[in-house]
C-alpha cells in the first residue's frame, strides 16, 4: 500500500552493531518509528552473544543493492549525494577517501539502516522502495531526491524488490525451526498489531485496520485474536492466520485491557470511561451479555491462575476489585493510596492465587498483596540506580510500569521508566537478581538521551525469554531470563503498548 503523506526524515543511527532488526508493514499514513529517533543499546552485547540471524541476505545487499545507491541517474540526485547528509531518515556511510565502494564494516551499517525501512517479503510495504518511487506508480507524493524510479518495472527498483521479496525463503544456517508461540504487540499510534516469531525475533505478520488498538488476547484454540479498540469502543475479533477482522462487538464504553476466562468461553473487557465496569462477551455468540459493575474506570483486568476470579484495577478510584467468575459479581475490594496500574500473579502449588504484585501510580516499585488475607503485606521499592529517566518523557506519574511473573513461577520482572531498565527478582523470596538496561532514544535536537518508556511484559512459554514493549522507542526488547542479557531489539511500530504471547496449537 503506498504512503499517502510525506514525512519529515531524521537521521537515525544504531550504535549496537551486530543486533539484527526486521522491518514492519505499516498503515499508509503511519511514519516508521525509526524516523523520529535513533535507538542505541545502552548495555552492549558481547560479540556473538545471543544474536539472531537477519532475514534479509547481507551479501545480496552488498553486491546488488548497495551499488544502486552510488549510481548516477540522469535528471536525479544520486542516493549517495543526499543520504550521507544529516537529517536523513535513511543514512548512508561516507565512502573512505579515494574509494569507490564501502568497507565491509560500513556496508554492515548501511545494511542495518536499510532493513529498518523494509518489510521482509513485501516490497510494496517497504519504505525503501515506496518513498523514491513516482506517485503515479504507487510511490510517495514527494521525495527530496526526485522520482528515482518512474515505475515498478525499473530494473534497479526490481533488484531491490527481489532482495526484499527473497527474504521469505532465505533461512540462515543453524536457524531454529518455526517456534510454537507468537508474541503480539499493539502499536497504539500506528493502528497496527505486530506479530513476532520468537525463533527469529523478527516481525512475521502485521494486522491492520484497528485504530488505537490497546489490549490483545486469544481464543484457547488460537484461531482468534481479540483486540480492544479504543477509537471505536469495540472489541475486534480477528482471524489469526489471515489477519482479517471478522467482527466488531460494541462495548459499554471506552476500553483498556482485557482478558479471557480460563475455559475460553468469556472475554472480559475493562471499561475505562465512567462509570467503568467489566464487559462480558460470550465467545460463542460474540455478543456482549452483561457489564459487571465495579468502582471506577478499569485500566487492567486479569484472570487468576486457577481461573476462579477476575481482578480489575482502577487508576482513578485506586481500587483493586476481585470478581467471582461463577457469580460474575464483585467478591471483595482493596483500597490503595495510589492509582492501580499493572499486576502480576503468583500461584500456590495447587494453582490458587498466593500473591498479587501491584504497580501503583507514583511508585517506582510494587505492592505485595496476600490474596488469602485480602491485604497489602509489603511494598517493594526498586533501586535508585540506575536512574535519571522518566521526567523528559512525561512519565513521573508512572515511574514503574509493566510487571510479570515468568510462566515457571521462579522470577518476577518489573519495568522501571525511571531507570530505563527491567529488574528481576527471585520467587518466592523476592531477592533482587539484577537488572537489564533498555534502549536509549537519541532524538535530534536533544543533547541528553531519553528512555524507551517500557510499558508491558510477556514471556515465551518456556520462561527463557522476556519481551518488553518500549513505547518511546517503537520497539520490543527481547532478554534472556537466565543470563540477563539483551538478545534483540525489534522495531514494531509507533507507541507499542500491550504485549501478549500466543501458544500455537
Language-model segments: residues:
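Sec-dependent N-terminal signal peptides
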Residues: 2-24
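Serine/threonine-rich, low-complexity intrinsically disordered segments
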Residues: 6, 10-12, 42, 306, ...
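Aromatic- and Gly/Pro-enriched helix-to-coil junctions and flexible linker segments
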Residues: 23-176
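Alpha-helical and His/Cys-centered functional microenvironments
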Residues: 7, 14, 31, 218, ...
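Detector for intrinsically disordered, low-structure N-terminal pre-sequences
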Residues: 6, 13-15, 64, 117, ...
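Mature extracytoplasmic/luminal segments of secretory-pathway proteins
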Residues: 6, 76-79, 398
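Predominantly soluble domains enriched in secretory-pathway, periplasmic, or organellar proteins
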Residues: 171-505
